[in-house]
């Protein structure tokens, strides 16, 4: 069962659960006035906890469709509930199933709705910010919509990796950054160097919002890579030779 966008269940979830969550945790929201009241946009948060997407769904006033692991839909209950909440299941093994999820995301955006995707591709178990994958940039170029970097701070402390239950009475900050507009690149929509440039700009903005240390590898590829300041990588993103050099050392995204 494929999600075709966030539905009424997410609206009800927000209405019922938000008052309860506000009693359990303290939320500090910044930059939410930057989000458009209508029209398509892509929200790209860092990912350090299972709670990241849930807290965004609670506090963003519009419904959001999010990509989620297909493994979550392993029972008849989750097969109904997660798509009704707006989850678009993606098979991380790649191939046609992964492409189907991105096609669904494109339809969501073309209907003028919000779509959320974690550019790191998976949760960061050590709290570092990892290299972003180019899916969000590719979608934004196809649809012509802005990308909003999102910084989520505190969810890792609320529910650390492998913790079954979240801790209460803790703080969570959610920051919406300045939109990244892709119109200036539309005539180079198929250029992977441009997609990489947009994605690096996105990860730099997320780093500015969260203060996380950055690692220049994809999440799960290497836990031993030295942290590299994002600024060192994107300071010359306009330099074509710099982009070509970075591409040469990157795995296909």
Label every model-predicted segment.
Residues 33-35, 106-107:
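Short amphipathic alpha-helix with an adjacent loop that forms part of the alpha/beta core around
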Residues 32, 46, 69, 93, ...:
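Generic beta-structure capping elements
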Residues 22-30, 97-99, 156-159:
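Short gly/ser/thr-rich secondary-structure transition/capping motifs
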Residues 15, 22-23, 35-97:
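Catalytic core of membrane glycerolipid acyltransferases/transacylases, capturing the structured
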Residues 29, 66, 87-89, 147, ...:
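Conserved beta-strand scaffold positions in the cores of enzyme catalytic domains, especially
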């Amino acid at each position: 069962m494929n999600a075709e966008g966030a539905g009424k269940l997410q609206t009800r979830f927000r209405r019922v659960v938000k008052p309860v969550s506000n009693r359990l945790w303290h939320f500090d929201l910044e930059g939410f006035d930057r989000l458009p009241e209508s029209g398509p946009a892509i929200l790209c948060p860092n990912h350090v906890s299972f709670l990241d997407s849930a807290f965004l769904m609670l506090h963003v006033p519009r419904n959001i469709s999010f990509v989620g692991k297909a493994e979550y839909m392993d029972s008849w209950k989750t097969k109904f509930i997660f798509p009704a909440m707006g989850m678009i299941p993606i098979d991380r093994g790649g191939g046609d199933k992964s492409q189907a999820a991105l096609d669904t995301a494109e339809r969501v955006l073309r209907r003028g709705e919000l779509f959320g995707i974690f550019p790191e591709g998976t949760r960061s178990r050590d709290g570092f910010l990892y290299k972003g994958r180019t899916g969000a940039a590719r979608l934004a170029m196809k649809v012509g919509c802005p990308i909003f970097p999102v910084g989520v701070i505190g969810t890792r402390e609320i529910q650390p990796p492998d913790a079954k239950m979240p801790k209460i009475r803790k703080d969570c900050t959610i920051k919406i950054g300045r939109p990244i507009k892709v119109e200036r690149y539309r005539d180079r929509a198929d250029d992977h160097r441009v997609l990489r440039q947009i994605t690096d700009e996105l990860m730099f903005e997320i780093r500015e919002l969260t203060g996380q240390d950055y690692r220049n590898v994809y999440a799960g590829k290497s836990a031993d890579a030295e942290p590299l300041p994002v600024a060192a990588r994107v300071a010359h993103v306009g330099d074509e030779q710099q982009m070509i050099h970075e591409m040469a050392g990157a795995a296909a995204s």
